[in-house]
Curated annotation (Swiss-Prot):
TM region(s), chain numbering: 16-34, 41-66, 73-105, 129-152, 156-183, 191-223, 233-256
EC assignment: 7.1.1.9
Subunit structure: Component of the cytochrome c oxidase (complex IV, CIV), a multisubunit enzyme composed of 14 subunits. The complex is composed of a catalytic core of 3 subunits MT-CO1, MT-CO2 and MT-CO3, encoded in the mitochondrial DNA, and 11 supernumerary subunits COX4I, COX5A, COX5B, COX6A, COX6B, COX6C, COX7A, COX7B, COX7C, COX8 and NDUFA4, which are encoded in the nuclear genome.
Keyword Mitochondrion recorded: yes
PANTHER family: CYTOCHROME C OXIDASE SUBUNIT 3, CYTOCHROME C OXIDASE SUBUNIT III
SUPFAM superfamilies per the UniProt record, alphabetical: Cytochrome c oxidase subunit III-like (SSF81452)
InterPro entries: Cyt_c/ubiquinol_Oxase_su3 (IPR024791), Cyt_c_oxase_su3_dom (IPR033945), Cyt_c_oxidase-like_su3 (IPR000298), Cyt_c_oxidase_su3-like_sf (IPR035973), Cyt_c_oxidase_su3_a-hlx (IPR013833)
Parts of the chain on the Mitochondrial matrix side: 1-15, 67-72, 153-155, 224-232
Domain of life assignment: Eukaryota
Organism: Madoqua guentheri
Protein name, per record: Cytochrome c oxidase subunit 3
Gene3D superfamilies hit by this protein: 1.10.287.70, Cytochrome c oxidase, subunit III, four-helix bundle
Amino acid sequence: MTHQTHAYHMVNPSPWPLTGALSALLMTSGLIMWFHFNSTTLLTLGLTTNMLTMYQWWRDVIRESTFQGHHTPTVQKGLRYGMILFIISEVLFFTGFFWAFYHSSLAPTPELGGCWPPTGIHPLNPLEVPLLNTSVLLASGVSITWAHHSLMEGNRNPMLQALFITIALGIYFTLLQASEYYEAPFTISDGVYGSTFFVATGFHGLHVIIGSTFLIVCFFRQLKFHFTSNHHFGFEAAAWYWHFVDVVWLFLYVSIYWWGS
């Protein structure tokens, strides 16, 4: 921040936007190669470069904020707006899936047998694994709030305990969802029901994995004393994201599992 007359962070030249663009090219080309020629070489290369880019880019952001002090209150305000806009974009992303589901289920076509679930589909019991999954995510919402309040009060150990519980619950949810997919009596190719079910719940599951990874990073950062009671936006963003994942699941449970069955 030397020789600056403003509170903004002037970012140094970085290779990561270029490697990120390259990884996007490799991933999209790799998907085409996988779909048409059953070759995963290019896709694997794209995913690997994408993961390496994300790791190193966020590592640099942590260095700039924690060790170099570039994240002033003004910069943090901008990051908050950015995270809010990102979550709004995710809400609209999931709105598309709910739209597809309700479009198909509220007025089933003759091809579906004129009923919902379509003829021949045996939906999952909403009072079994889906209800347990709901309980797990609601409990994780409580524990992440406990972690946040502990951090704001400067209670390091309770914060670590609560964050560890949240991560464990997130991993447990993922394992339950994987077992449910494995045992489901229908597949993604079983018409519009299978498509909407697996795409909506699958993307939510991916978001749980991303959120769990975000929280694991926060856990290791807290072990290294990166967060203080008044400077912890990295954790706050992870908590916001986790609450978003919670709320989306409640809508999925009520719409697809309970009403849709």
